[in-house]
Amino acid sequence: MTLMSSLNTLFPGQPPKFEPHITISSNIDVDLDHPDKTKSDVYRILSASLVAIDSLPKNHSNLVTLGKVDSQRKFFKKLYFQVARDPNLVSFATIIRELFVQLPADIEQENMKKNPHLYTTDSHGNTVKKKSKQSQDGRIEAIDMPRIQSEAQEQASLWSVTEFDPHLSLVYNDLHPIDSALWRTIKTRIQDYLNIDNCDSDDLTDNGLGWDNGILKLVLCEGDVNDWVVLGSADLH
């Protein structure tokens, strides 16, 4: 039995099983409507991500360093290890956020303003891009890419400071609050499995666990946790 499966038994219901991971960014822009485009998007994103991580300084051993165990009210942060805000990790997350979340969204917004004839409203009231044959008519006004790229970079940098919260989840659950008796049991389990004393100490910024390489995965996180789908993966070296 792993630590995570052991901790799951302490919580009510049946907490979902998932791989231990650190979320770099959510809302990655992938075309899910056309299988061929989905495949090419996934390949492009993972390839660019490998280039990005290879470009970071090779000045220390661990990209990921685990710290204290903590808990929040949120389902997805019920029980987790804090992760140190390593400069390389933050830089990598910022690059991914800029290229594959902020920039595509900003380009789309600008196109809606400059070229409204390219868009229509679907049956749910959402603004969507017309299919290619529907959007052939009308002049296309160019958008200011240098400005958009600069603004996307600024927004991603701001996100890395105000929102990026690296952590490694151990349990997903709705239980709140965690009482002192359960918390003591959690600490004992972690100590038994990982030999970490005082695992919830505020002074614990490095519990001795960490790594530099690993596997980068692009995951479709829709619906139940057990239904999440790995769209693609790449080894980090």
From Swiss-Prot:
Positions bound to substrate: 23, 169, 172
GO cellular component: Golgi apparatus
Catalytic activity, as annotated: a nucleoside 2',3'-cyclic phosphate + H2O = a nucleoside 2'-phosphate + H(+)
Major location (coarse): Golgi
Enzyme Commission identifier(s): 3.1.4.37
Residue ranges the record marks as coiled coil: none
Known role: Involved in the metabolism of ADP-ribose 1',2'-cyclic phosphate which is produced as a consequence of tRNA splicing.
Protein name: 2',3'-cyclic-nucleotide 3'-phosphodiesterase
